[in-house]
Regions:
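Helical hinge/lid and interdomain linker segments adjacent to catalytic or ligand-binding clefts
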Residues: 34-38, 43-134, 267
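Bacterial N-terminal signal peptides
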Residues: 10-21
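Signal peptide processing junction and immediate N-terminal pro/mature segment
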Residues: 22-28
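A glycine-rich, often tryptophan-bearing local segment used as a flexible ligand/cofactor-contacting loop or short
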Residues: 103-178
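Extracellular ligand-binding/catalytic regions of CAZymes and related secreted enzymes
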Residues: 29-33, 39, 47-50, 54-62, ...
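N-terminal secretory signal peptides that target proteins for export/translocation
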Residues: 1-6
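Catalytic beta-strand/loop cores that center a nucleophilic Ser/Cys/Thr
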Residues: 66, 154-251
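Extracellular/periplasmic catalytic domains that process cell-envelope and extracellular macromolecules
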Residues: 29-32, 61, 88-92, 118-120, ...
Length: 298
């Protein structure tokens, strides 16, 4: 639980970087886009799944999309039934949002249908623990952009460097965004038998099948190691590269990812975070334009 003084500090600083009180431009007079929200706790159950589902459902009413939530978080992982999520079912949606970890109970054909859905023009929105999903299906990682390797301390005040201030997911921000949340570090190379302890998810032992690369995605935000207090943060070093949000195009589709969203309360009391997530969703759904061209090494 974040301490009240630190939470107030972040709220004040966040207000300074929020350029508009609106989460998105008024939706055009057209049928709302349809977003399927998948939650699943195959490895670890985040308490933020319920608040996230409720928040995104509400936000969509004013942002041009409607949410179908399967409420996977209320079921024990072994009993979750996703047998209906087929290519035909996905055809009824414009995008899929995922706060999931581990292997969802989906057949190889269903997994491939999800990837093909994006390749053929659908949108994918991955939030926080989505990067711990389908370690044994590298094509999912190709769509999302990378896989989780380790968590960076919770309840720490990080300063994020905003690398793209024109994209719908970040244009509400100034050059820096101070925020308290759990951030992630991503695998930079695939696991190899000659390096059995490298490129492995340090929490659950999953072998990372592909490495994150700035040559593949357009990074929107990364940890500013000059402005962030690194005292006690053994996971990162000053001058290191720690992307936390990015976008990419995959075939005719779009993929947006953010590491943020671990905290329950961030889904209800942070207008900057709301604008960030809604902007990313709208971009992934094709409601707004934004450059996804990779810019290579920082």
């Amino acid at each position: 639980m974040t301490s009240r003084p630190k939470a107030r500090l972040v709220a004040v600083l966040g207000a300074l970087v929020l350029a508009s009180s609106h989460t998105a431009p008024a939706a055009a007079q057209q049928a709302p886009k349809r977003l399927l929200f998948l939650t699943h706790a195959g490895l670890y159950k985040h308490s933020s799944l319920g608040p996230a589902e409720a928040a995104v459902t509400a936000w969509g009413r004013d942002a041009g999309f409607e949410v179908t939530a399967l409420q996977g978080y209320v079921q024990e992982a072994p009993s979750l039934d996703l047998s209906m999520v087929t290519a035909e079912y996905l055809a009824g949606f414009d995008g899929v949002m995922m706060m999931t970890n581990g292997n969802l109970p989906m057949s190889p054909a269903q997994r491939q249908a999800l990837v093909d859905f994006v390749r053929n023009g659908g949108g994918l929105v991955g939030v926080h623990n989505a990067a711990l999903t389908f370690y044994d299906f590298p094509e999912f990682g190709e769509v999302l952009g990378g896989y989780f390797r380790r968590a960076i301390r919770q309840r720490h005040l990080f300063v994020l460097r905003v690398e793209d201030r024109e994209h719908p997911a970040t244009r509400m921000l100034g050059p820096s965004w101070p925020i308290v949340d759990e951030l992630y570090q991503y695998g930079t190379a695939p696991w190899g038998a000659d390096r059995p302890e490298e490129n492995v998810d340090v929490l659950f032992g999953n072998r990372i099948p592909m490495g994150f690369s700035r040559d593949r995605v357009r990074v929107l935000m990364s940890i500013d190691t000059e402005l962030t207090d690194l005292d006690g943060l053994e996971e990162i070093v000053r001058g290191g590269d720690y992307p936390q949000s990015w976008v990419r195009e995959y075939g005719r589709g779009r993929s947006f990812y953010t590491s943020l969203g671990h905290r329950d309360d961030i889904w209800s009391n942070d207008p900057v975070f709301r604008a960030h997530v809604v902007g990313g969703i709208r971009w992934a759904l094709g409601l707004e334009d934004g450059d996804a061209t990779p810019r290579g090494a920082r």
